[in-house]
UniProtKB/Swiss-Prot annotation:
Extent of the signal sequence: 1-18
A GO term for molecular function: low-density lipoprotein particle receptor binding
Residues annotated with Phosphoserine modification: 147
Quaternary organization: Homotetramer. May interact with ABCA1; functionally associated with ABCA1 in the biogenesis of HDLs. May interact with APP/A4 amyloid-beta peptide; the interaction is extremely stable in vitro but its physiological significance is unclear. May interact with MAPT. May interact with MAP2. In the cerebrospinal fluid, interacts with secreted SORL1. Interacts with PMEL; this allows the loading of PMEL luminal fragment on ILVs to induce fibril nucleation.
Sequence repeat residue intervals: 80-101, 102-123, 124-145, 146-167, 168-189, 190-211, 212-233, 234-255
Region of interest (LDL and other lipoprotein receptors binding), ranges: 158-168
Keywords, sorted A to Z: Chylomicron, Endosome, Extracellular matrix, Glycoprotein, HDL, Heparin-binding, Lipid transport, Lipid-binding, Oxidation, Phosphoprotein, Repeat, Secreted, Signal, Transport, VLDL
Methionine sulfoxide sites (modified residues): 143
Species per Swiss-Prot/TrEMBL record: Hylobates lar
Key word Membrane present: no
Protein name per Swiss-Prot or TrEMBL: Apolipoprotein E
Chain intervals for the UniProt region annotation (Lipid-binding and lipoprotein association): 210-290
Domain of life: Eukaryota
Homooligomerization: region residues: 266-317
């Protein structure tokens, strides 16, 4: 009878434990939730994610991990992942710095300094992970033939701390990059406004010159200049609408517009000079002929005056 009661009690307790285990589902690790928040798909973040996944695998300290830790396989893999991450991060940072050109120098310098410090912290964290694994390999090789259980426990504890610090610094870097990107977007918008303000007077000046000189050179030239001015204004409006996303393209188009304005102004000046030369060639012969006729008339008048002034001979002797 006691055996039966004992069997029933064990069965009851086992059923209760099974219900408790089914009711409590494991929640994802806080680190995994935080990692998912800052990974937005940028190339440097994807590279850092590969480094992170490899570090999680190393932290399991499985038999395969322990075998590869005794060689240089793990450190070589980590080095390659570190280099890839820093390369992608540097490229992304350079891209943002190019977009920050219209921003004030003081603001750009401050953002660059903060981002550089955050990037250095992340690189130092990754370097600490690699250095700790190299140290572990040396310690294990020194204790060859002895128990390394204590070394593995210390390594596991240290790797957990390094992972937390790495995740914290990666999150900080991602936030600073977001601020950096917001500054670049704001600078691009300011740059568009500044470009429009600078080009507006140039376009208007070109239109006025075309109207003034074209009235001398002829009506067709004026019509061509006005049509070109209309096309230029339409082109500038089209460029202004797309500048926010393609600031580099706007810079190239600005240079092209300025070159066209200078070329058109030069052509107008040359046409005005040619017109002036034609006018001069028309009137110079007429002026010279008038001068010759005037000189001949003066000579005739002088001759006539001289003849009338001569003395008349007397008849008395």
């Amino acid at each position: 009878m006691k055996v039966l009661w004992a069997a029933l009690l064990v069965t009851f307790l086992a059923g209760c434990q099974a219900k408790v285990e089914q009711a409590v589902e494991p929640e994802p690790e806080p680190e995994l939730r935080q990692q998912a928040e800052w990974q937005s798909g940028q190339p440097w973040e994807l590279a850092l994610g590969r480094f992170w996944d490899y570090l999680r695998w190393v932290q399991t300290l499985s038999e395969q991990v322990q075998e590869e830790l005794l060689s240089s396989q793990v450190t070589q893999e980590l080095t390659a992942l570190m280099d890839e991450t820093m390369k992608e991060l540097k490229a992304y940072r350079s891209e943002l710095e190019e977009q920050l050109t219209p921003v004030a120098e003081e603001t750009r310098a401050r953002l660059s300094k903060e981002l550089q410090a955050a990037q250095a912290r992340l690189g130092a964290d990754m370097e600490d992970v690699r250095g700790r694994l190299v140290q572990y390999r040396g310690e294990v090789q020194a204790m060859l033939g002895q128990s390394t259980e204590e070394l593995r426990a210390r390594l596991a504890s240290h790797l957990r701390k390094l992972r937390k610090r790495l995740l914290r610094d990666a999150d900080d870097l991602q936030k600073r990059l977001a601020v950096y990107q917001a500054g670049a977007r704001e600078g691009a918008e300011r740059g568009v406004s500044a470009i429009r303000e600078r080009l507006g007077p140039l376009v208007e000046q070109g239109r006025v010159r075309a109207a003034t000189v074209g009235s001398l050179a002829g009506q067709p030239l004026q019509e061509r200049a006005q049509a070109w001015g209309e096309r230029l204004r339409a082109r500038m409006e089209e460029v202004g609408g797309r500048t926010r996303d393609r600031l580099d393209e706007v810079k190239e188009q600005v240079a092209e517009v300025r070159a066209k304005l200078e070329e058109q102004a030069q052509q107008i000046r040359l046409q005005a000079e040619a017109f002036q030369a034609r006018l001069k060639s028309w009137f110079e012969p007429l002026v010279e002929d008038m001068q010759r006729q005037w000189a001949g008339l003066v000579e005739k008048v002088q001759a006539a005056v001289g003849t009338s002034a001569a003395p008349v001979p007397s008849d008395n002797h």
